């Protein structure tokens, strides 16, 4: 009986060793096993349903440029945190730009550091698009372009954010006659001091459907003759398309070599202000009647709009900016360095200006309009 039991044990042990050997052989020579859980891997069909690995906080997402940046981030499968101070109905247009659960809306206070810390603490990318065309009793240009960006940059650095992108202006200069541009220049410096690896974007005047550039000039037809300082013969502009700026920002997020650099985003052509406004009115099929208005008189007119209780159509500072020639910064990288071909104004102007046409010309083609004359100065 004992011998039989012993033989049975031996047979069991021998079978166990062979089974182990077979299992080991199948493991070594079989298909490789997945080592990561599927939830950790990028998945989906691509586009908004994919996972890019980017978690971006976009300050100023409710503005003109912000909607394009959020859309480009959302269409590549990024999670976007959108701080807002406005009414909830003013952010409804952003909700379809990302997949379910990919857009997170958080109320914030621009002067509360705890509020800022809360919206950046889980992000690996922070983009600052905060801007204002005119000062208010609550926020002047120093608040908007210096103090708030400085606080965001400092708290982003403390939170361990990998990428910080700050949008300034091509003509930012501490010696500028425009208070707007002087504060933009100071803002660049304080952001660079707080976050040395920050990426600073310096776009020229941006045009697009919701802009305050082409639309602002086109709306002058309501006042009859068009006032221009020195008739616009002394000012050169190089506007850039909003989609190009948005793509450039997103490409800078993905570019590992962009950290710590400043980029100048400009359009492919430079125009005298006179020729540019003339082209705007030609596309809108409006009568162009320019007349020279001295800048001091232009400022008086702007002051009247500033004291009105409504959104000012023009301000004294905007008069200054409108008549400042766009700088050439060949030492800075641009859109081409981020893989983007700048879009000519003539290809997209109709998208902006069609709504300024009368019913008679609403469906007219753009081919009957001569392109604006370009300059090389």
UniProtKB/Swiss-Prot annotation:
GO terms for cellular component: mitochondrial inner membrane; mitochondrial matrix; mitochondrion; respiratory chain complex I. Binds 1 FAD per subunit. InterPro entries: ComplexI_NDUFA9_subunit, Epimerase_deHydtase, NAD(P)-bd_dom_sf. GO terms for biological process: circadian rhythm; ubiquinone biosynthetic process. It is found in: Mitochondrion matrix. Keywords: Acetylation, Electron transport, FAD, Flavoprotein, Mitochondrion, Respiratory chain, Transit peptide, Transport. Pfam families: Epimerase. Belongs to the complex I NDUFA9 subunit family. Complex I is composed of 45 different subunits. This a component of the hydrophobic protein fraction. Interacts with BLOC1S1. Interacts with SLC2A4. Interacts with CLOCK. Interacts with RAB5IF. This is NADH dehydrogenase [ubiquinone] 1 alpha subcomplex subunit 9, mitochondrial. It comes from Pan troglodytes. The lineage of its organism: Eukaryota, Metazoa, Chordata, Craniata, Vertebrata. The gene is NDUFA9.
